[in-house]
Design a protein with these regions (language model features):
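Active-site beta-loop-alpha junctions enriched in small/polar residues
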Residues: 110, 138, 168-172, 199, ...
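Short beta-strand/loop segments at the ligand-binding rim of alpha/beta enzyme cores
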Residues: 162-167
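Conserved phosphate-binding/catalytic region of the ribokinase-like
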Residues: 2-7, 154-155, 210-301
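Conserved N-terminal subdomain of the carbohydrate kinase-like
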Residues: 52-135
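Anion (oxyanion) recognition and catalysis
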Residues: 47, 73, 154-158, 188, ...
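Glycine-rich phosphate/adenosyl-contacting loop at the front of the ribokinase-like
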Residues: 1-78, 117
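Conserved phosphate/ATP/ADP-binding segment of small-molecule kinases
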Residues: 159, 173-244
Length: 301
């Protein structure tokens, strides 16, 4: 592949995660403000490993949007494609973290700035010169972001980028499950690489078993499929078949928020520097990349 200005460009939601903490002495629940949004997290994770990354998206021109931009700039992620819009608020997510590390979400996004990005607002200098273009599914919940997502994916693919897709399901952001299923599946024909969790396999493919789901996606034209399985690691599938790759023990059981994004940032980083076309990568090489991603994720828990 010809040299590109960016190794990985991500597009989609950037938001604030207000993550639950221990109650104060009066019993009031406290929340910590953290930068969030799966695509933005992936860009940061890959940049920390040394990849050249950029983010395309929109936040509000408010205290939260300014904070998010400063975080990406501090992490040395290219922010020329991050717009701050005074007409819309930055999306907020309230995250309840259980003792097990599992999470429940509530969103303030009616509408959020991230759902109001127009295709005319995309930074084409970045979009047209990236090796990997990564998107999620939360930009498909509302217009105009949905049309902008398809425009960006089609343009990047035409320009030779590898399309990476993470259908990240958040039930409360969709009108109903059937709508989510239709929209989330609509990007699969464009994807070269797909990451899903074992909780999303049935929704996205109709198959609950990770092996069957991965095989189905590969038959739909996806070259590489990764299914994350929490503490049990991940399952990787390509033309050579599939293999389960065990995870690493976390330093301690805690907040799992962002672990999957860190895994994917690590995996895409290895894809970037493989020195091979995606179709030429062996199952053994991909297994090594998954192991690397698992190690990165374990450091985030």
């Amino acid at each position: 592949m010809e040299d590109k200005k960016c190794d990985i460009t991500t597009f989609g939601e950037i938001l604030i995660d207000f993550t639950s903490q221990k109650p104060n002495e009066d019993g009031q629940m406290l929340y910590a403000r953290n930068p969030g949004g799966a695509p933005a997290n992936v860009a940061v994770a890959a940049r920390r490993l040394g990849a050249r990354t950029a983010f395309l998206g929109k936040a509000g021109k408010d205290m939260h949007g300014e904070f998010l931009r400063s975080v990406l700039e501090k992490e040395q992620v290219d922010t020329r494609g991050l717009l701050l819009d005074e007409k819309f608020f930055t999306t907020l997510a309230f995250v309840e973290v259980q003792e097990s590390g599992e999470r429940t979400f509530s969103f303030a996004r009616k509408p959020g700035a991230d759902t109001n990005i127009q295709k005319e607002e995309l930074n084409l200098d970045i979009l047209d010169h990236t090796m990997i273009f990564h998107v999620g599914s939360l930009s498909l919940t509302d217009q105009p972001a949905r049309d902008t997502t398809f425009y960006a994916v089609e343009r990047a693919k035409k320009n030779g980028s590898i399309i990476s897709y993470d259908p990240n399901y958040r039930a409360s952001l969709w009108r109903d499950e059937e709508t989510a299923k239709i929209q989330m599946r609509s990007l699969i024909p464009y994807a070269d690489i797909v990451k899903i969790s074992d909780e999303e396999t049935e929704l996205l493919t109709g198959y609950k078993q990770v092996e069957e789901a991965a095989k189905f996606l590969h038959q739909q034209g996806v070259a590489v499929v990764a299914v994350t399985m929490g503490e049990h690691g991940a399952y990787i599938y390509n033309k050579d078949g599939g293999v389960k790759v065990p995870g690493f023990a976390a330093r301690q059981i805690g907040d799992t928020n962002g672990a999957g994004d860190s895994f994917w940032g690590g995996f895409l980083y290895r894809i970037c520097y493989a020195g091979k076309q995606l179709k030429d990568l062996t199952k053994e090489e991909l297994e090594e990349y998954v192991r690397f991603g698992n190690a990165v994720a374990s450091l985030c828990v």
